[in-house]
A protein has these predicted regions:
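Acidic (Asp/Glu)-rich catalytic clusters
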Residues: 15-26, 80, 84, 109-111, ...
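Generic enzyme active-site microenvironment
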Residues: 28, 32, 66, 95, ...
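Conserved, mostly hydrophobic/aromatic
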Residues: 28-30, 58, 109, 134, ...
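Mid-to-C-terminal alpha-helical segments outside catalytic/metal-binding sites
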Residues: 57, 164-195
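Active-site core of metal-dependent hydrolases
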Residues: 79-126
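Short acidic/histidine-rich active-site segments
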Residues: 140-162, 184
Length: 195
């Protein structure tokens, strides 16, 4: 997680590389950038450095990535643009976890091959951009998420989140798109298996 990179050492990267090669590992993440809690160019530089190295590890072991990006839209998209430009052969780069940016940015991520992770926030009253995003991107590029234990959907907002809450996310996506919840469930399950 980006919040933890300040303490990372080279030995940690070596251990991560070793663990990532285990058969049970299906993706590398959460990796990315988080400028919400700490400010400053030095801290941003450290995050960017480790993010790029973790992307390279995922490429090396041929695993998708789970991207965390909070208050770091421009830096995240630029790093991923550069990564995809150098690695166009990667068919399934990963998911932008707990997506919270604009529909336009989501479309660019989708064009790069990423899935867009939609969680409990889509049920919140103030989630206008996310609702627009869900309406505008292909259902074939959406994954449903919990972000457990955080961001529990309405009507249970503020409580501990878990996988039993995913139904509310599916129902909201179906409502936004004007389709049956079963269609959302079927397609997003196929998406998750494909990723």
């Amino acid at each position: 997680h980006p919040d933890e990179v300040e303490a990372m050492k080279e030995a940690d990267m070596e251990e991560l590389s070793h663990m990532a090669k285990e058969d049970k590992v299906v993706a590398i993440g959460e990796i990315g950038l988080d400028y919400f809690r700490k400010e400053g160019n030095a801290y941003k530089g450290i995050q960017k450095e480790w993010f790029c190295r973790q992307l390279d590890l995922a490429k090396e072991i041929e695993k998708p990535v789970i991207i965390h990006s909070r208050d770091a839209a421009e830096d995240t998209i630029q790093i991923l643009r550069d990564f995809r430009k150098k690695n166009p052969q990667i068919e399934n780069p990963g998911v932008i976890h707990c997506y919270s940016y604009s529909p336009e940015l989501a479309k660019e991520y989708v064009a790069m091959g990423f899935y867009i992770g939609i969680g409990g926030v889509v049920t919140f009253k103030n989630a206008k951009k996310l609702v627009e995003t869900v309406a505008q991107i292909p259902l074939e590029r959406i994954l449903v998420e919990t972000d457990s234990p955080y961001l529990c959907p309405e009507p249970n907002r503020g409580k501990r989140n878990d996988s039993s809450q995913i139904r509310y996310v599916i129902d909201r996506i179906a409502d936004i798109r004007g389709i049956a919840p079963e269609e959302v469930e079927k397609q997003t399950e196929m998406n998750a298996r494909k990723m």
